[in-house]
């Protein structure tokens, strides 16, 4: 059923609102994917905070017009699914991970920070840890010396409680 002009304006407004908040847009060709697989992809995207939508390319071009993602308009041909995310790597990760398990989804292009990315650059972007993962790694690195020192103090306290002289442990390098 074709959309009337009011429906088209509503779709463009909805997608434009998502694009305004986005850091990354990834475009992939979905030709030949079953409805069940597409439903799984949508569920995964939803849990990762990625806005995933199949759009008419003309409506998508209008939604990105006048934004840092306008350069992506040249890549908008054929049956495409659009992944839009506020996180820099989420949409690339979701679509790239799905493309690894389903060869019918082909990454076409993306846009990040005002730059248009080819499929290889989108895959490279997907390999970068997310902000939350980076914070967790940083906290782990910062916490390691403190937890080692706490274990050392606990060992010294245990030795003293036993009545044996405590041996100094060599500091970890």
From Swiss-Prot:
Q: What terms describe the molecular function in GO for this protein?
A: large ribosomal subunit rRNA binding; structural constituent of ribosome
Query: Matching Gene3D superfamilies, A to Z?
Result: 3.30.70.1730, 6.10.250.290
A Pfam family in this protein?
Ribosomal_L10
One GO term of the cellular component aspect? large ribosomal subunit
Record-level GO BP terms: translation
Q: Which InterPro entries match?
A: Ribosomal_uL10, Ribosomal_uL10-like_sf, Ribosomal_uL10_bac, Ribosomal_uL10_bac_type, Ribosomal_uL10_CS_bac
Q: Which UniProt keywords apply?
A: Ribonucleoprotein, Ribosomal protein, RNA-binding, rRNA-binding
Cite the HAMAP family for this sequence: Ribosomal_uL10
In UniProt terms, what function does this protein have? Answer: Forms part of the ribosomal stalk, playing a central role in the interaction of the ribosome with GTP-bound translation factors.
Q: What does the subunit comment say?
A: Part of the ribosomal stalk of the 50S ribosomal subunit. The N-terminus interacts with L11 and the large rRNA to form the base of the stalk. The C-terminus forms an elongated spine to which L12 dimers bind in a sequential fashion forming a multimeric L10(L12)X complex.
Name the family the entry cites. Answer: Belongs to the universal ribosomal protein uL10 family.
The name under which this protein is listed is Large ribosomal subunit protein uL10
